[in-house]
């Protein structure tokens, strides 16, 4: 098994860490859930704008027009899918005053997992192709993806557990979203392999960077504010950026990233 594929699998498997955190002890509060969403948004924004997009633009054979064009394509592609797909948000599962029916819980969990899986799938491809092109950069991106997959797993498992009271169900739905990322890496390994040119790798990174920025600004940050109106989600965003920035500095200082 190749190192890039192993990195992709480990990054996707980090979702289970968040899932276990979401079901251990007491059910997570709205404040914790909102903070985790802001934290994930901060990591996504920093890694997209400070690592993925610059790396894509600096790739051999990549022109600024193509690089920024693919980034904008990722932005517009996300907003297009966001408008077409039905929405199901974590706070829909956090209603404590009404006991939802099992069918409605299942439907909401499916839609929520689908949305995150659509985001995770291209991340898996991007992690694999980036690590195939540059193992050091791929390691940094895999680390970033793994870090934001932890609160992402919490964001899925926490509300599902709060609504159903079933730890197994919560971990299952969170795990599915993480498996989508692994699937993206496996498909890239099977179909693309070593045939990917640096330009194609860079284009994929630029597209995914656009998707991650759009997801952070349009979904995660507003959702965090809606779940916990009494607290500013910017604190979570700043913490996420700080943790990610500090980890990247450590990697670069150690000569890894």
From Swiss-Prot:
* Cellular component, GO, one term: plasma membrane
Q: Which GO molecular function annotation, any one, does this entry have?
A: zinc ion transmembrane transporter activity
Q: So where does Fe(2+) get bound?
A: 120, 123, 149, 152, 181
- Coiled coil region boundaries: none
Q: Which UniProt keywords apply?
A: Cell inner membrane, Cell membrane, Ion transport, Iron, Membrane, Metal-binding, Transmembrane, Transmembrane helix, Transport, Zinc, Zinc transport
Keyword Zinc recorded: yes
Q: What residue intervals traverse the membrane? A: 5-25, 32-52, 61-81, 137-157, 171-191, 195-215, 236-256
Repeat: present as a keyword of the record? no
The record's similarity note reads: Belongs to the ZIP transporter (TC 2.A.5) family. ZupT subfamily.
This chain's protein is named Zinc transporter ZupT
Query: Organism, per UniProt?
Result: Escherichia coli O7:K1 (strain IAI39 / ExPEC)
Instruction: Identify the taxonomic lineage of the organism of origin.
Output: Bacteria, Pseudomonadati, Pseudomonadota, Gammaproteobacteria, Enterobacterales
């Amino acid at each position: 098994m190749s190192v890039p594929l192993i990195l992709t699998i480990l990054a996707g498997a980090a979702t289970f860490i968040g899932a276990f955190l979401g079901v251990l002890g007491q059910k997570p509060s709205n404040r914790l859930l909102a903070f985790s969403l802001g934290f994930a948004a901060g990591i996504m924004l920093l890694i997209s704008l400070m690592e993925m997009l610059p790396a894509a633009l600096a790739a051999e054979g990549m022109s600024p027009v193509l690089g920024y064009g693919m980034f904008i394509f990722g932005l517009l592609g996300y907003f297009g899918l966001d408008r077409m797909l039905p929405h199901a948000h974590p706070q829909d599962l956090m209603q404590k005053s009404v006991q939802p029916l099992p069918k409605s819980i299942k439907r909401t969990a499916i839609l929520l997992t689908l949305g995150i899986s659509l985001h995770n799938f291209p991340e898996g491809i991007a992690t694999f192709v980036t690590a195939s092109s540059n193992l050091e950069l791929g390691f940094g991106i895999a680390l970033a993806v793994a870090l934001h997959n932890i609160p992402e797993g919490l964001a899925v498992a926490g509300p599902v557990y709060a609504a159903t009271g079933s730890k197994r169900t919560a971990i299952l739905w969170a795990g599915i979203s993480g498996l989508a990322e692994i699937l993206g890496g496996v498909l890239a390994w099977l179909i693309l392999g070593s045939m990917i040119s640096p330009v194609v790798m860079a284009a994929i990174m630029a597209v995914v960077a656009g998707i991650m920025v759009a997801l952070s600004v349009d979904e995660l940050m507003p959702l965090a504010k809606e779940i916990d109106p009494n607290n500013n989600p910017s604190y979570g965003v700043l913490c996420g950026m700080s943790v990610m920035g500090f980890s990247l500095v450590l990697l670069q200082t150690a000569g890894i990233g």
